[in-house]
């Protein structure tokens, strides 16, 4: 199959969004965030600073190590600029990124085999998907000194209860690893509080950036398409690490 344009990739990607979030964990992602938390968590700075002082050291799962070795082999054979699509779900965003960046190698990672199995291959040869735990995969990249040109984190599981802060990407012990990967980083969410927390946490680890609303053109994920069609406000954090 020949490579498709970005417009064609988006138009032809008609996979279904199931009830399971495309990202961390197994909670469902409702159409509108249901939460009692109306502002950034008061414990966020303390937690991020704790993680900076006490590096995350969870052993890497074997399937994630094997997935990383696949990437490492391909990267060593053809060291193109590397773009990582963490929590890629069905991989629509990975395919769109590959179409947008033909000069790069785009890798989508997700911990769910069932979500990855729903991927629709659309012809581009500069991307592939791996089943891996994102946080451990980040550490593998850091330890192997493989830098990122760009990193995308699109609509991560919001974990909307205030008590679930440590389950959010920016509350996780692995969050400071992002600073060591370098490159441009973009995170998108349909929850303003989550996006504001992410921006605050990113600055604490050395990534000042911008937070704004935007209109997706084209939508990068199935969830983004759904949220946009239903008129939800979408939030975007963008920043660049100096490595």
Language-model regions, residue ranges each:
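S-adenosyl-L-methionine
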Residues: 2-82, 92-100, 120-145
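Conserved beta-strand/loop positions that form the S-adenosyl-L-methionine
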Residues: 86, 109
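Class I SAM-dependent methyltransferase "Motif I" SAM/SAH-binding loop
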Residues: 87-91
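Conserved SAM/SAH-binding beta-strand->alpha-helix loop
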Residues: 112
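Charged helix-capping and loop-helix junction motifs
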Residues: 166-174
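Conserved beta-strand signature within the Rossmann-like core of class I S-adenosyl-L-methionine
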Residues: 182-189
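Class I S-adenosyl-L-methionine
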Residues: 194-201, 205-243
């Amino acid at each position: 199959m020949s490579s498709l344009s970005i417009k064609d990739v988006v138009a032809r990607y008609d996979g279904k969004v199931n009830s399971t979030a495309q990202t961390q964990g197994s909670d469902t992602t409702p159409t509108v965030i249901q939460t009692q938390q109306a502002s950034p968590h008061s414990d966020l700075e303390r937690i991020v600073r704790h993680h900076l002082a006490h590096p995350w050291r969870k052993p890497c799962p074997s399937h994630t190590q094997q997935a990383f070795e696949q990437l490492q082999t391909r990267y060593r054979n053809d060291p193109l600029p590397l773009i990582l699509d963490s929590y890629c779900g069905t991989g629509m965003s990975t395919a769109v990124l590959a179409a947008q960046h033909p000069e790069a190698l785009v890798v989508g990672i997700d911990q769910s085999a069932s979500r990855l199995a729903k991927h629709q291959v659309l012809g581009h040869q500069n991307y592939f998907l791996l089943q891996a735990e994102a946080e451990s995969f980040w550490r593998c990249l850091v330890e192997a000194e493989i830098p990122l040109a760009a990193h995308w984190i699109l609509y991560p599981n919001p974990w909307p209860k205030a008590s679930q802060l440590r389950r959010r990407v920016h509350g996780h012990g692995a969050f400071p690893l992002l600073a060591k990967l370098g490159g441009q980083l973009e995170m998108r969410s349909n929850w303003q509080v989550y996006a504001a927390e992410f921006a605050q946490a990113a600055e604490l680890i050395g990534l000042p950036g911008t937070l704004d609303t935007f209109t997706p053109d084209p939508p990068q994920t199935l969830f983004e398409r759904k949220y946009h069609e239903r008129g939800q406000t979408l939030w975007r954090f963008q920043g660049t690490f100096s490595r």
